[in-house]
Amino acid sequence: MDGILGRIVAIVLGLLALVGIAYAGYNGFQSHKAGVVATNITQLITNARAGFSQGNNGYTNFTTANIASMITGGMFPSDMVRGTALVDPWGNAVTLAAANNGSQGVITFGGGNGQTAKQCVSAALGLKDYVTLAVGSTTFNQTNLPDQATAGAACSATATFTLTFQ
């Protein structure tokens, strides 16, 4: 009887350990997505500055309509490209636009209910070097940067990010 009880306890403990490992892996993967967002958007901004800011038109051609041509030119991180479209790690479409007479670029992403509020906060805190960052209905800038509390208040699973850079 002791042998059977010992085996049952060992099996239960083994299953609990597997559940714990799976949960930790899932949380790590979810946090990783927010880091990928920050890395990809930062790389995109760097590439856009190199490809557009020095031209006579500024960011005028930095638009969703020109994504296919910019893919050909290697503008985007490869994991953002799906055919002739751009997506974020949560599977949402990424759109591009010019603002302020072509002197600024605008990147919109997120908002498709694929992100968690925690990922939203991590992404908001990880994004840097922008003119403005709108998260949902809250706008941040270089004199009003997000922190854990303000990003937490702005974030949700449906919050859209709109980042404007120069």
PLM regions: where:
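Membrane-proximal N-terminal amphipathic helix
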Residues: 26-64, 68-69
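Periplasmic/extracellular, small/polar-rich flexible segments of pilin-like filament-forming proteins
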Residues: 53-166
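Generic detector of short, well-ordered, non-transmembrane alpha-helical segments enriched
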Residues: 21, 40, 116-119
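N-terminal single-pass transmembrane signal-anchor helix
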Residues: 1-37
